[in-house]
Amino acid sequence: MLHGDISSSNDTVGVAVVNYKMPRLHTKAEVLDNARKIADMVVGMKVGLPGMDLVIFPEYSTQGIMYDSKEMYETASAVPGEETAIFAEACRKAKVWGVFSLTGERHEEHPHKAPYNTLILMNDKGEIVQKYRKIMPWVPIEGWYPGNCTYVSEGPKGLKVSLIICDDGNYPEIWRDCAMKGAELIVRCQGYMYPAKEQQVLISKAMAWANNVYVAVANAAGFDGVYSYFGHSAIIGFDGRTLGECGEEDYGIQYAQLSKHLIRDARRNGQSQNHLYKLVHRGYTGMINSGESPRGVAACPYDFYKNWIKDPEGTRDMVEAMTRSTPGTDECPIEGIPNEAAASNY
């Protein structure tokens, strides 16, 4: 793991993250103009960072947040489509991989169902290698249709890459799912705003440590008339230490080199902090000392996860019993979100 240079090598993958200024757009033409701006930035960054293998832009960087529902549906993208064609040309020209946001991607039943919040991983030939749809939209505000699966793809120089989006990262389950599928780099693209800066910086570092995985965070910056975005795009080592982190500045860039050998060696030879291995080899020292299996215990000891798989509806009822039974709350009602007071009128 190297930081401070502009190079990369056969062993290291050069990764850049961008504090892209949150755009405020209203039409398809404006979206395509902004996509060309992103494409120009990709090509320009490669000149300044010749080792850059992968460039990552934040959630909402292509379309911004469409606070008007009509505009959101009208500007929703097809994948592949006009926006991805612009990005593909830039990736081919710069000979670089990219992660780009599409908010939203048209649902299969568009316009009868809400769009998806989507990321794509594109290779240096302009081909879409991974398309990820946000599993945990930021309710109650975000109205995206939820995705249902994480992916791992072979990325630049063979590094294994997973994509997640913003609020996804507040749930440890998604990080573990990606890591246990073999991800060596988890990319978290976000359009996160104040006041949650401290918490979001913290959790990405903690999840890198807990999952023995590189993390690259690209976050929006600036003010879009509604929210103020805190930036702090960062690249984090698999030991949870930050390699490079932006401040709040618009269009800030951080860059680091991620060693394939180091993470694979750590996962192979690490012992006391090899969290992936230890999770499914519980207590092997005590079992060896007891004359039992040297591989420890593999079975899941966590009742919540067992129950969730076996009985999802019953598990939801259990959670509602200790939280609430409706999506909204009476004490802070949000238009369009049912709360207990509204439910009692039916």
From Swiss-Prot:
HAMAP family (UniProt xref): Aliphatic_amidase
Entry keyword annotation includes Hydrolase: yes
Keywords for this protein: Hydrolase
Superkingdom per UniProt: Bacteria
Active site: 59, 134, 166
Keyword Hydrolase: yes
Top EC class of this enzyme: hydrolase
SUPFAM superfamilies from the UniProt entry: Carbon-nitrogen hydrolase
Entry's EC annotation: 3.5.1.4
GO molecular function: amidase activity; hydrolase activity, acting on carbon-nitrogen (but not peptide) bonds, in linear amides
UniProt family annotation: Belongs to the carbon-nitrogen hydrolase superfamily. Aliphatic amidase family.
PANTHER family for the chain: ALIPHATIC AMIDASE, NITRILASE C965.09-RELATED
Task performed by this protein: Catalyzes the hydrolysis of short-chain aliphatic amides to their corresponding organic acids with release of ammonia.
A Pfam entry, by short name: CN_hydrolase
Protein name: Aliphatic amidase
Reactions performed catalytically: a monocarboxylic acid amide + H2O = a monocarboxylate + NH4(+)
Ranges where the CN hydrolase domain occurs: 13-260
